[in-house]
Amino acid sequence: MSNLIPGEIIPEQGEIELNLGKEVKTVTVSNSGDRPVQVGSHYHFFEANKALIFDREITLGMRLDIPAGTAIRFEPGDTTDVKLVSYSGLKNAYGFNSLVNGSLDT
């Protein structure tokens, strides 16, 4: 009989560094809305809720630098700095708020 749990991940000992070698940008974000806004780890930050005020142009092709499956919540009136990393792979974005629907390479 095995003690393995289906789907279990057993990492090696030591620290695991996320997004190793990727360029990181820090962006200041303010929630100008009257409701909290939550943005997930792999959401195309450029297309985040319009109530979030930040320099959108520099966030094209970027996502939050946080573990997969997690999110950051922006409370109304709050201003915070977040770290972003660029997407990998084919660098295509479809859906979200339909602002790109294609290649993220400019």
Curated annotation (Swiss-Prot):
> Could you tell me which CDD domains the record lists for this protein?
Urease_beta
What keywords would UniProt list here?
Cytoplasm, Hydrolase
GO BP, sorted A to Z: urea catabolic process
Q: What Gene3D superfamilies is this protein classified in?
A: Urease, beta subunit
What does the entry list under GO cellular component?
urease complex
What's the catalysed reaction?
urea + 2 H2O + H(+) = hydrogencarbonate + 2 NH4(+)
Per UniProt, the enzyme's principal EC class comes to hydrolase
Q: Please state where this protein is localized.
A: Cytoplasm
What's an example of a GO molecular-function annotation for this chain? urease activity
* Source taxon at top rank: Bacteria
Q: What SUPFAM superfamilies is this protein classified in? A: Urease, beta-subunit
EC number(s) in its UniProt entry? Answer: 3.5.1.5
Pathway stated in the Swiss-Prot or TrEMBL entry: Nitrogen metabolism; urea degradation; CO(2) and NH(3) from urea (urease route): step 1/1
Q: Which family does it belong to?
A: Belongs to the urease beta subunit family.
Q: How does it assemble?
A: Heterotrimer of UreA (gamma), UreB (beta) and UreC (alpha) subunits. Three heterotrimers associate to form the active enzyme.
Q: Which HAMAP family does this one have?
A: Urease_beta (MF_01954)
Protein's name according to its UniProt entry: Urease subunit beta
Q: Which organism is it from?
A: Prochlorococcus marinus (strain MIT 9312)
